[in-house]
Amino acid sequence: MKRLKINYILIGVVTLLLALALWPNITWRGGQGGQLEEIKSRGELRISTLNSPLTYFTTKQGPSGLDYELAKRFANYLGVKLVVIPHKNINDLFDDLDDDDADLLAAGLIYNQDRLSRARTGPAYYSVSQQLVYRLGTARPKTFADIKGKLAVASGSAHVSTLKQLKQSKFPDLSWEASSDLTSKELLEQVADGKLDYTLGDSVTIALLQRIHPQLAVAFDVTDEEPVTWYLKRGTDDSLYAAMLDFYSQMVDDGTLARLEEKYLGHVGSFDYVDTKTFLSAIDSVLPTFRSLFEKYASEIDWKLLAAIAYQESHWNPQATSPTGVRGLMMLTRATADGLGVNDRLDPEESIQGGALYLQRLMAKVPDSVPEDERIWFSLAAYNMGWGHMLDARKLTKMQKGNPDSWVDVKQRLPMLSQKRYYPQLTYGYARGREAYNYVENIRRYQVSLVGYLQEKERKAAQEAAEQADQGKGYPAVTPELALNF
């Protein structure tokens, strides 16, 4: 899969040009009438969104998601409260806009010309391609002419418009079903489960779901990269639109947009079927032996992250030993183990307790200037290569005019720690920075797989329990709506 990157220079230039074009009509700074003044008088910015692993979901810690965080920041920027209206169906989003129940749609929607008669778009904040998906083990189609079976897409999605264009221009015999009951994510899951032959999805959602459904396979790209944008009601004044342009320009300039992309999309890289399949198998067969220990000693972090670290270190093998002498589930060196009070590195409980304590000590060293949700990545890189080399990575980032408190900036410098043109200038010298980079990225992917896979098992178990309970009641089973949140 293509690495997802935002063209921040292009976004900045386009935003500036649009702002200049709109400048004579901008009323929001003076607060004189218009849609923005209505929002400020109301004290609320109302957004309609979709429940999904990327856009908006809820956890024990509260709401989360890329679009939620962007919208929350926009509401704060405007000085109002954010009100979120979640939906399952895309058509409901645009109904909210038409009925003035929402001020904007923040739902990870692809730019689509068919929607422009009802709404206008905001700036792009990342891009995706539309892809045809099939189940691994079945025949891979090379074009739509090779499709033999049922193709379904979500009603109201950009995929419907894409298929209509293809039918008109290239494939007159192309047919599909537009489902109003199932979301794009649910259709992808049906393909993974063998209940549907094909569907279209966006490259980000597909990449996320492959972490828990490795049998999902991409046949081919249906479109080139397309922008993902917010939508506003067409026909209103430009005050809210102009404020949005200014907000996005600021987000690009201060690096916030890059940080959010890193948080939600940074782990979406190349997909390894064998590695993912092996990991998911280990979740069922090996993890139950150690789960209670991970839960017991993961005090400052999610136990699933601690488990992901251990898998990256040893593949959950308590007897693991490397040629350099590191040993055990958490692969501790003798010196580190002595400093942590670990007597037997091959004892699973001692190893997990020691590794968790070592990680806590590293997290305590991370400067307070580093954002709370990024501190763990600095700590993990240091866990792999040592705290001194992490200081060097921050130093090099600052030397190159980057932000030493931003993980997206610092991680780009990690591979440079092994390059002769850089490491002689640094305090702690040569380091295997590329290994540290891959180490953190792998752990992030394992964590995503673990969280998603366990939630999927819980969802299926709840569904089966509901169906069994309803079998004797004389009415159809109702599938509970349990969102898959990464």
From Swiss-Prot:
<dbReference type="InterPro" id="IPR023703">
    <property type="entry name" value="MltF"/>
</dbReference>
<comment type="similarity">
    <text>In the N-terminal section; belongs to the bacterial solute-binding protein 3 family.</text>
</comment>
<dbReference type="GO" id="GO:0071555">
    <property type="term" value="P:cell wall organization"/>
</dbReference>
<dbReference type="InterPro" id="IPR008258">
    <property type="entry name" value="Transglycosylase_SLT_dom_1"/>
</dbReference>
<keyword id="KW-0998">Cell outer membrane</keyword>
<protein>
    <recommendedName>
        <fullName>Membrane-bound lytic murein transglycosylase F</fullName>
        <ecNumber>4.2.2.n1</ecNumber>
    </recommendedName>
</protein>
<dbReference type="InterPro" id="IPR000189">
    <property type="entry name" value="Transglyc_AS"/>
</dbReference>
<feature type="region of interest" description="LT domain">
    <location>
        <begin position="269"/>
        <end position="486"/>
    </location>
</feature>
<dbReference type="GO" id="GO:0016998">
    <property type="term" value="P:cell wall macromolecule catabolic process"/>
</dbReference>
<dbReference type="InterPro" id="IPR023346">
    <property type="entry name" value="Lysozyme-like_dom_sf"/>
</dbReference>
<keyword id="KW-0456">Lyase</keyword>
<dbReference type="GO" id="GO:0009279">
    <property type="term" value="C:cell outer membrane"/>
</dbReference>
<comment type="function">
    <text>Murein-degrading enzyme that degrades murein glycan strands and insoluble, high-molecular weight murein sacculi, with the concomitant formation of a 1,6-anhydromuramoyl product. Lytic transglycosylases (LTs) play an integral role in the metabolism of the peptidoglycan (PG) sacculus. Their lytic action creates space within the PG sacculus to allow for its expansion as well as for the insertion of various structures such as secretion systems and flagella.</text>
</comment>
<feature type="region of interest" description="Non-LT domain">
    <location>
        <begin position="22"/>
        <end position="268"/>
    </location>
</feature>
<dbReference type="InterPro" id="IPR001638">
    <property type="entry name" value="Solute-binding_3/MltF_N"/>
</dbReference>
<comment type="similarity">
    <text>In the C-terminal section; belongs to the transglycosylase Slt family.</text>
</comment>
<keyword id="KW-0961">Cell wall biogenesis/degradation</keyword>
<dbReference type="GO" id="GO:0009253">
    <property type="term" value="P:peptidoglycan catabolic process"/>
</dbReference>
<keyword id="KW-0732">Signal</keyword>
<dbReference type="GO" id="GO:0008933">
    <property type="term" value="F:peptidoglycan lytic transglycosylase activity"/>
</dbReference>
<feature type="signal peptide">
    <location>
        <begin position="1"/>
        <end position="21"/>
    </location>
</feature>
<feature type="active site">
    <location>
        <position position="313"/>
    </location>
</feature>
<dbReference type="Pfam" id="PF00497">
    <property type="entry name" value="SBP_bac_3"/>
</dbReference>
<keyword id="KW-0472">Membrane</keyword>
<dbReference type="Pfam" id="PF01464">
    <property type="entry name" value="SLT"/>
</dbReference>
